[in-house]
């Protein structure tokens, strides 16, 4: 209300300013100094506060007084010099406790690995995976013999095979199965042994080979046929 009465009594007139374009063209606005945006205040000027300030004097703090003050620190921190610890210091037993704890942890891990994870079993190696060149006769072996292997016969087995060869140089299927069971060999092993023994016997007795003998007989028949044809031509 006081402000409005002042405006009425003073007959205040609203000022009129030219447009901004005229200001920019006629350079009415002078260049302002950097200090224009931060106007300095007089040192003598003091703005009266709204509330009266109480007479409070600030006390400066000194580092020595702060360190030596009796203010207790916040939290669970306690002064070691003022309050002695109820438990005595045990420097020698601490490492022993840590070592025992680590050992128990290692034992627990080992038990977990043994109980939870099964141990790795060795890989199964089948007979066909082995590269065997010379094999000894195994009496408990009943399966087929691996290929490209040379069997080492025992003295007793060779003696029994020689007896069979002395009576008959060719074995029947039934006799071959019986001898294979008695000598703990396979039929293939006995068959190969008899083949080799027959070749050796022919070589010792200097008998001609059956293949060469048949070829020589064929050549003789051819020669006789040629001679007969020549004689017939001459007679004509």
Swiss-Prot record:
Q: Which Pfam families does the annotation name?
A: Homeodomain
- Give any GO molecular function from the UniProt entry: RNA polymerase II cis-regulatory region sequence-specific DNA binding
Q: GO CC: one term?
A: nucleoplasm
Q: Residue numbers of motif Antp-type hexapeptide?
A: 125-130
Show the InterPro entries listed in the entry.
Antp_homeobox_Deformed_sf (IPR050609), HD (IPR001356), HD_metazoa (IPR020479), Homeobox_antennapedia (IPR017995), Homeobox_Antennapedia_CS (IPR001827), Homeodomain-like_sf (IPR009057)
Q: Which GO terms describe its biological process?
A: angiogenesis; anterior/posterior pattern specification; definitive hemopoiesis; embryonic skeletal system morphogenesis; hemangioblast cell differentiation; positive regulation of transcription by RNA polymerase II; primitive hemopoiesis; vasculogenesis
Principal location class: nucleus
The places in or outside the cell where this protein is found are: Nucleus
Q: Could you tell me which residues form the DNA-binding region? A: 146-205
What UniProt keywords apply to this chain's record, in alphabetical order? Answer: Developmental protein, DNA-binding, Homeobox, Nucleus, Transcription, Transcription regulation
| PANTHER family, sorted | HOMEOBOX PROTEIN HOX-D4, HOMEOTIC PROTEIN DEFORMED
According to its UniProt entry, the function of this protein is described as: Sequence-specific transcription factor which is part of a developmental regulatory system that provides cells with specific positional identities on the anterior-posterior axis.
Instruction: Give the UniProt family note.
Output: Belongs to the Antp homeobox family. Deformed subfamily.
Name used for this protein in its record: Homeobox protein Hox-D4a
The species is: Danio rerio
Gene name tied to this protein: hoxd4a
């Amino acid at each position: 209300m006081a402000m409005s009465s002042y405006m009425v009594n003073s007959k205040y007139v609203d000022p009129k300013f030219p447009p901004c374009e005229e200001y920019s063209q006629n350079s009415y606005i002078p260049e302002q100094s950097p200090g224009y945006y931060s106007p300095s205040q007089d040192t003598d000027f003091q703005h009266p506060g709204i509330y009266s300030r109480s007479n409070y004097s600030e006390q400066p703090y000194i580092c020595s007084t702060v360190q030596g003050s009796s203010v207790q620190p916040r939290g669970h921190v306690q002064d070691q010099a003022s309050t002695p610890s109820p438990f005595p210091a045990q420097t020698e037993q601490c490492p022993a406790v840590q070592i025992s704890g680590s050992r128990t942890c290692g034992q627990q891990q080992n038990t977990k690995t043994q109980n939870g994870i099964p141990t790795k079993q060795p890989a199964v190696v089948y007979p066909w995976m082995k590269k065997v060149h010379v094999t000894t006769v195994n009496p408990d072996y009943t399966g087929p013999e691996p290929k490209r292997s040379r069997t080492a016969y025992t003295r007793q087995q060779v003696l029994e095979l020689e007896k069979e060869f002395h009576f008959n140089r060719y074995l029947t299927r039934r006799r071959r199965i019986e001898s294979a069971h008695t000598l703990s060999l396979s039929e293939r092993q006995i068959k190969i042994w008899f083949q080799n023994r027959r070749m050796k016997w022919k070589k010792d007795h200097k008998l001609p080979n059956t293949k060469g003998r048949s070829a020589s007989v064929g050549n003789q028949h051819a020669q006789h046929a040629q001679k007969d044809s020549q004689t017939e031509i001459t007679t004509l």
